[in-house]
Amino acid sequence: MVVKIGIIKSGNIGTSPVLDLLLDERADRPNIDVRVFGSGAKMNPEQVEDVVPKVDQFDPDFCIFISPNPGAPGPAKARELLSEKDIPAIIIGDAPGKGKKDEMDEQGLGYIIVMSDPMIGAKREWLDPTEMAIFNADILKVLAETGALRLVQNTIDGVIDGAAAGNIELPKLIITAEKAVEAAGFENPYAKAKAIAAYEMAGAVANLDMKGCFMTKGFENFIPLVAAAHEMAASAAALADEAREIEKGNDSVLRTPHMKEGNTGCKTDLISKPE
């Protein structure tokens, strides 16, 4: 069976650019078919109301909606629209979504909340396209190297298996540092500690960016705050790199590629084949 997955992207978090790619990293997985629908950088209710219905034309077995802050007006509208459809749906969001998990339960929606996928320092006096890209690259590195993205991959793969078996169980997952590094499979305890530190640092970026973006007046006051937040993101990425380098030195980097049947393989030794 080929499982059809509809992905709706509205706005952007660090996980967004690679979400569909995590499920088919070499574009040769035979048991899934994915379509992505998006509203670009904007996530207002009017964009959401336009893009969410487009998933119906693909007739997916389940769909995923990913955006910042699942409680914001646009994503809240998306949740409302998805809860009314006869399609199992999963919401992927950042830390503010944790406060909406009871609502998502009531709406019959699954969720994956990536706690350390932080908001960006979105002030015109600071953020240009180059800075935006650098920030997202740093956060993506943290999420990949600490294991958070592998946990997203594994969780959605579980839903795919359920869909193929005719029994979808929607996830209810809050990705903490501990859960992320468990998925990463670190063998060296120092590498694991560095990865935990990197994940928690990335989570703290959001607090500083929120202070700079919403709680501080005067560009001379908020620019240092959002700049500091982005420096924290860069440092978190460097720390995550250090964790992976330790595992490389031990030849113990866990790799979990999708196999030719679509199932997940596993290997650690570099010069070996996944099983």
Curated annotation (Swiss-Prot):
Pathway stated in the Swiss-Prot or TrEMBL entry: One-carbon metabolism; methanogenesis from CO(2); 5,10-methylene-5,6,7,8-tetrahydromethanopterin from 5,10-methenyl-5,6,7,8-tetrahydromethanopterin (coenzyme F420 route): step 1/1
Catalysed reaction, written as an equation: 5,10-methylenetetrahydromethanopterin + oxidized coenzyme F420-(gamma-L-Glu)(n) + 2 H(+) = 5,10-methenyl-5,6,7,8-tetrahydromethanopterin + reduced coenzyme F420-(gamma-L-Glu)(n)
GO biological process, one term: one-carbon metabolic process
UniProt-recorded Gene Ontology molecular function terms: ferredoxin hydrogenase activity; methylenetetrahydromethanopterin dehydrogenase activity
Pfam families the record matches: MTD (PF01993)
EC number(s) stated in the UniProt entry for this protein: 1.5.98.1
Keywords assigned by UniProt, alphabetized: Methanogenesis, One-carbon metabolism, Oxidoreductase
InterPro entries per the UniProt record, alphabetical: MTD, MTD_sf
Catalytic class of the enzyme: oxidoreductase
Function: Catalyzes the reversible reduction of methenyl-H(4)MPT(+) to methylene-H(4)MPT.
NCBIfam families xrefs: PRK00994.1
Similarity section: Belongs to the MTD family.
Name of the protein in its database record: F420-dependent methylenetetrahydromethanopterin dehydrogenase
Source organism phylogeny: Archaea, Methanobacteriati, Methanobacteriota, Methanomada group, Methanobacteria
Gene: mtd
